[in-house]
A protein has these predicted regions:
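Flexible active-site lid/hinge loop adjacent to a nucleotide/diphosphate
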Residues: 1-79, 117
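Adenine nucleotide phosphate-binding catalytic loops in nucleotide-utilizing enzymes
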Residues: 24-32, 36, 65-178
């Protein structure tokens, strides 16, 4: 690592190991060990942002010296429900909104105000936005700043080339993704 401790670490998923075969990472277990390193290096005052719906990622929670913010589309997922019941920070989808909650406190961000999700229709982008919201919250970024960033972010070839860039061309929608 290029740092000793971090205030926020984010692990979005391990899944089926989409990046296997790169840099001697050949198994899902190898990938989990590698991604867990940043969780282990969270400052005691910091947060690990973990996907509650990915069991390998959720299992990283005990390795974090700081606190955990779990995120998942399903707020009723057992990991999410337990974490919420304990009054801890969670980020989830409720209808047409992303909700950040801690105890009885809630902040809501409407998906219609987050262009990258296309009104919540692009599920993996909703997941990415939940992780981004949790990370920004973990460093106490003001909610107005978080909203402004989400509403103004455009996933185009200038800032994220080849990463699910959506373009309209002559009446057709074109997606560039590698």
């Amino acid at each position: 690592l290029g740092f000793d401790r971090c205030q926020v670490a984010v692990v979005t998923n391990i899944g089926a190991g989409d990046h296997l075969g790169l840099n001697y990472i050949t198994t899902v277990e190898d990938l989990a060990v590698l991604k867990r390193v940043i969780v282990q290096n969270v400052a005691t005052t910091g947060y690990a942002v973990l996907n509650a719906a990915d069991p390998i990622v959720a299992a990283m929670a005990p390795a974090c010296p700081g606190k955990i913010i779990f995120f998942a589309s399903d707020r009723h997922h057992p990991v999410m429900a337990t974490h919420r019941a304990q009054g801890h920070r969670t980020v989830y989808v409720d209808g047409d909104s992303i909700v950040a909650s801690e105890g009885s406190w809630r902040e809501t961000i409407h998906l219609r105000d987050v262009p990258i999700t296309r009104n919540g229709k692009i599920g993996f982008q909703v997941e990415n936005v939940m992780a981004a919201v949790a990370a920004a919250w973990g460093v106490d970024m003001p909610w107005q700043t978080i909203r402004r960033g989400l509403s103004g972010f455009v996933n185009d070839s200038d800032n994220a080339p080849g990463r699910f860039n959506i373009m309209d061309y002559r009446g057709a929608t074109v997606i560039a993704d590698y």
